[in-house]
């Protein structure tokens, strides 16, 4: 139980340091991977439970003190919506893959990849006209675009990818570089479809 307490203490520091935007929370969630030893990673289900428990505690602070944490005078309703988006990003994979979490951890040692996309390069390349072949990647791209539509600015693409990698590292294989590129191009395509590209100078 000592390592669970250790996780909890570290997570309290991470999640309560700066909660002014969902993208920062997503970034902190992704950075948790670097805090955990291989032994703790191999206890994926316990880690996920510990994260959810602490997030539930933080949720109260976010919703009840939204104007403090958001820094932009968000209403309680807006804070609740943002909170739901955070949970969706962090835990979308859990239900379908937690049953097999014990068999995939030997792949984790050297598979933590950093996304190389940036705000400057995110929209440089034109997307292909092919329909998305991977529904999980498409859902990740959709969440990014939904955040742009709802909050008027794009989340840090690196942070969204890193959070997704964190959950994948516990329950499966992290996104490969080519998969990250697929998501990037899907985001461009969806933004063009929704006629949001003209507002990019306001988002970044």
Swiss-Prot record:
Subcellular location as annotated: Host cytoplasm; Host nucleus; Virion
Gene Ontology CC terms: host cell cytoplasm; host cell nucleus; virion component
Induction per the UniProt record: Expressed in the early phase of the viral replicative cycle.
Listed transmembrane segments: none
PTM comment: Phosphorylated on serine residues in the 115 N-terminal amino acids.
Keyword set, alphabetical order: Early protein, Host cytoplasm, Host nucleus, Host-virus interaction, Phosphoprotein, Viral penetration into host cytoplasm, Virion, Virus endocytosis by host, Virus entry into host cell
GO BP annotation list: endocytosis involved in viral entry into host cell
Entry function: Modifies the subcellular distribution of heterogeneous nuclear ribonucleoprotein K (HNRNPK) and may contribute to modulate HNRNPK functions related to processing and export of mRNAs during ASFV infection. Necessary for virus internalization.
Subunit structure as annotated in this protein's UniProt entry: Oligomer. Interacts with host HNRNPK.
Stated family: Belongs to the asfivirus phosphoprotein p30 family.
The protein's name in its UniProt record: Phosphoprotein p30
């Amino acid at each position: 139980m000592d390592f669970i307490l250790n996780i909890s203490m570290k997570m309290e520091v991470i999640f309560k340091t700066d909660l002014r935007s969902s993208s920062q929370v997503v970034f902190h969630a992704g950075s948790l991977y670097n805090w955990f030893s291989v032994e703790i990673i191999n206890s994926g289900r316990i880690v996920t439970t510990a994260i959810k428990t602490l997030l539930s505690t933080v949720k109260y602070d976010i919703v009840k003190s939204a104007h403090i944490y958001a820094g932009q005078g968000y209403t309680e309703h807006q804070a609740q919506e943002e909170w739901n988006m955070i949970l969706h990003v962090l835990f979308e994979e859990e239900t379908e893959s937690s049953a097999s979490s014990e068999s995939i951890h030997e792949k984790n040692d050297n598979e933590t990849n950093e996304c190389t996309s940036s705000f400057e390069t995110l929209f440089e390349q034109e997307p292909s006209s092919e329909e998305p072949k991977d529904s999980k990647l498409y859902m990740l791209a959709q969440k990014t675009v939904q955040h742009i539509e709802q909050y008027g600015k794009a989340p840090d693409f690196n942070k969204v990818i890193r959070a997704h990698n964190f959950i994948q590292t516990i329950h499966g294989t992290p996104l490969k570089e080519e998969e990250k590129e697929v998501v990037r191009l899907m985001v461009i395509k969806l933004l063009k479809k929704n006629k949001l590209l003209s507002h990019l100078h306001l988002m970044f």
